[in-house]
Every structure is written in structure tokens, then in C-alpha cells.
């Protein structure tokens, strides 16, 4: 038997924390070490336990998931933080990933999808729900003007303008 995945779950709603715990432990390959109600509480739990992964909600009182992710990744860079939330806000997604999150899943994902996401994050890859990927691609445009060396091609300023 392989070692179970050691997990901390952070969500301000007790029903969600408990539901995720029951669902993931039923897989037989996950051990939930602690439940936390804020990002700071998840960070404190990481100090006490040595998790492989933290499942983190994004919007929580006291210390949200982005702040919690930043604290955890600064102190424990080897711990994977996976955001699991109902929010598809691209601003939160980008900020969470910039602060070290290994991915972003929606709470309405199937139990198998969440477990698969945990495994993918542990393998070092970024996890992104399809709905979130589409939102990022639709709402994010990169405006980069084309550049080239006009002198190299012997173009006048007017020719470059055209």
C-alpha cells in the first residue's frame, strides 16, 4: 500500500470542510491532518503538521486563501496549495497562482476531479478546471504591438506606419 496523501482543508464553511474530508478520505488514499477556517489557520496547521497538499477556499474572513497561500508557500515551498472555490473571478485566479497556488478547481467538481487535481498538483503540474481555463482565455488578452527593425529593412517612418 502506498503512503496516503497528507492533506489540510481550509474553508470558512464547516459543512464544506467536513464534506471534503469525508469524500476524500473515502478514496482510501488521503489522510486529512487538519481542518482550518482561514488562510492563517491553514498556515498554522502547516506548522504543526507536514501536509503534502492544502485545499484552500479563496474567500474567507480574517485571512483569505490568497494570503494563506502566500504564507504557506513562503514558509513551506514544498507544500502544494490547491484553490477549491465557487468563484471563477479571473483576478483571484491569477493572484492565487502568482502567490504560489498549484491550481484552481471549482467546488462543484466531482470527487474524482478533485482527487485527480490533488494528484496532478503533487506531480508538480498546474491544475486548472476547464471552466476556469476558458474564463481566463476569454477575459485575458495580451496586447503586444508587433515590432521589427525598420532600418534593417530600409523602411521610412511612413512605410512603418502603414
Roles of regions detected by a PLM:
Residues 11, 57, 85:
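Active-site residues of response regulator receiver
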Residues 16, 35, 61-63:
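Residue-level signal for the "D+5" position in two-component response regulator receiver
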Residues 29-37, 45:
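Short hydrophobic/Thr-rich beta-strand motif most characteristic of the beta2 strand and flanking loop
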Residues 38-41, 62-67:
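Acidic catalytic/metal-coordinating carboxylates
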Residues 44, 66-78:
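Short amphipathic alpha-helix used as the core "switch/output" element in two-component signaling
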Residues 49-55:
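Active-site beta3 strand of CheY-like receiver
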Residues 137-161:
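Regulatory hinge/linker segments at domain boundaries
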